[in-house]
Amino acid sequence: MTEYLLLLVGTVLVNNFVLVKFLGLCPFMGVSKKLETAIGMGLATTFVLTLASVSAYLVETYILTPLGIEYLRTMSFILVIAVVVQFTEMVVHKTSPTLYRLLGIFLPLITTNCAVLGVALLNINENHNFIQSIIYGFGAAVGFSLVLILFAAMRERIAVADVPMPFKGASIAMITAGLMSLAFMGFTGLVK
């Protein structure tokens, strides 16, 4: 049980996929202008990342490895991720049309989010079992969502602040992301 808790905490805080591994930067910068959009994207990504992680594990364990076709791993995982994203898009469209409109183009772009493919591939490379795959995928998703929501809240505050002209827009966003990354470095010794 402790092993699973450490894996979860390590994935969320210590080895955050956005701030440490630099995966998922496109939605991190693109969807973080409004807090409600960031929350919606975080929830959708959490669902997709967890489900894609588990699905990739199952495809690897029960199809690719037994047939000896591990060289098709990346292509297979992209296909699995696309199916999971389409399913998520249909669910969001049915349950929350407002969120569906707010997320706009970013919902289908979860398919190309490198964090989703990165988590699936790292899961296999680190030889996680089924339970660890679920926890790793969920932890990565929670970490992504946490950082996305915190960053969106900071960007909303910065939007109304008196920022010098040369720092407005992307410049202050990158500085803020860098400071946020430094803050998360404080968790480095938490899990070994």
Curated annotation (Swiss-Prot):
InterPro entries: Ion_transpt_RnfA/RsxA (IPR011293), NqrDE/RnfAE (IPR003667), NqrDE/RnfAE_oxidrdctase (IPR050133). Keywords: Cell inner membrane, Cell membrane, Electron transport, Membrane, Translocase, Transmembrane, Transmembrane helix, Transport. GO terms for cellular component: plasma membrane. It is an enzyme of class 7 (translocase). The chain crosses the membrane at residues 5-25, 39-59, 63-83, 102-122, 134-154, 171-191. It is found in: Cell inner membrane. It holds the Pfam family Rnf-Nqr. Its EC number is 7.-.-.-. It is a multi-pass membrane protein. GO terms for biological process: electron transport chain. Part of a membrane-bound complex that couples electron transfer with translocation of ions across the membrane. The complex is composed of six subunits: RnfA, RnfB, RnfC, RnfD, RnfE and RnfG. Belongs to the NqrDE/RnfAE family. This is Ion-translocating oxidoreductase complex subunit A. The gene is rnfA.
